[in-house]
Amino acid sequence: MTENTAALPAAERPGTPALPQDLIDVDALLEAYRTGHPDVTDPAQKVVFGTSGHRGSAFTTSFNDDHIAAITQAVVEYRAHHGITGPVLVGKDTHALSGPAQDTAVEVLLGNDVEVLVDSRGGYTPTPAVSHAILHLNAGRELSPSGFAVDGDNAGLVDGLVITPSHNPPADGGFKYNPPHGGPADTEATTWIADRANELLAAGLAGVHRVASADVAGHAKLGGFDFLDRYVSDLPQVIDVEAIREAGVRIGADPMGGASVAYWGEIADRHGLDLTVVNPEVDPRFGFMTLDWDGKIRMDCSSPNAMASLIERMTPDADGQAPFDVATGNDADADRHGIVTPDGGLMNPNHYLAVAIDYLYRHREQWPQSAGVGKTLVSSSMIDRVAGDLGRELVEVPVGFKWFVPGLLTGTGVFGGEESAGASFVQFDGSPWSTDKDGLLLCLLAAEIIAVTGQSPSERYRDLVALHGDPAYARIDAPATAEQKAKLKTLSPDDVPVTELAGETILATLTNAPGNDAPIGGLKVVTQHAWFAARPSGTENVYKIYAESFRGPEHLTQVQAEAQRLVDAVIG
């Protein structure tokens, strides 16, 4: 990097290594966590549960000790309301705020006489490892999609807290609740917990029970669970590690400074894989990262800018040789995956989902023939075509991995995937593996595909293109006021009077997902060769337009332009 480049603002240096001026002051962040107190009259400082829990930063007084104490107390009361009496598993990622937030949560849980299990190795815990552990500990109990016992007796059931803001920047914190089904909590649960947490904040935390930090160590209700051993030991039940080992597939795994760092080394050792942990460094500033598209440090393993160093490392040399057959990335809690191949570079998440589905449904012979293919409605229609070729039902659901939980839990849905590089699938015998997204699993699947087929996932995608066509896909943002976003969220098909989109007859106008009839919180319009979906942003005054065309980039541009005009007209 030249001296002139170093002088540029961060937003003008995407894909380049972070500089000292780009890094957070960890001490100041932790001090803000301890001393900041939210203004409950400010919506930006209240507890808000999105699809991935509550997120914020201590610097903006949206993720502080008060928030975590209130949320944890609310979770305790939610459990009591439903008679859930088993231990709470608590895991954390490598973000600076995750450690102190775990301390807060444990103190409140113990203050309420709740049994707590933390990582027995004192390490970091990926989201999928917590999900897998919950399912393991609740094995033998028949659970409903909401996470409760079918027989109505929730006594002894285990649930969990995962402290992570996922791929968010280093100054952020995040806090998720996973009910006894192991997956993301549904809207009923998150609304209840958020409302109660905000009541507790408004009351100055009156009603929050908590032990002193000095009383945590040695507390009778505090125990340990070996998340890593359980997860790594069980991998042969879901991935053909023997095929990967025997084929000698060379894997380069980049934890991106996240919770998967110890897992990858143990996976290599335990299963005898030719696997190199590309960057084993853990730094709460994430100072080893390259900057994302907007100049922020973001552990987004689907971003070419955030993955720039790994992509560069995988570039074949003059002799056409690359150091690995596949390189992989995971975000901070390892619920997302990034796949880099020598012949294709960083794969588009939609492309890899299509490849994974095509491979799995052809190579998991014990999976029930009646099980459909789960996708979110903003994922590529290449998946629709692959599902049709496989003779499988397409199960299209709204955005949010929680919608895949019922299928993964019962085996009626053996795979669920999102366009944002999150997916999971069941074990060889059809039993659940993880009801939350599992980035390690999807990375290992890429190695299995190479081992079994002799082709890279990129090659496999080119085969799918030859068979089904080559879609152009993109997402753009369009401005919208809060009132317009609210209107978009509650549209009905009758509000859309048009019959054509970009020269094609509209075949479907959807405001509910066809796979489960749940509201999509927006609009999807489908033609023979294209579609678009519009959804309001939860954090900005914009709405997102996802669009795809099998007629090429120019037609996609036309679809996007007409989609924006249509939506703007409808929401006024």
Q: Which sequence ranges carry the predicted segments?
A:
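Short glycine-rich or small-residue beta-strand-to-loop segments that form or flank ligand, phosphate
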Residues: S57-A58, P87-D93, V130, R250-D254, ...
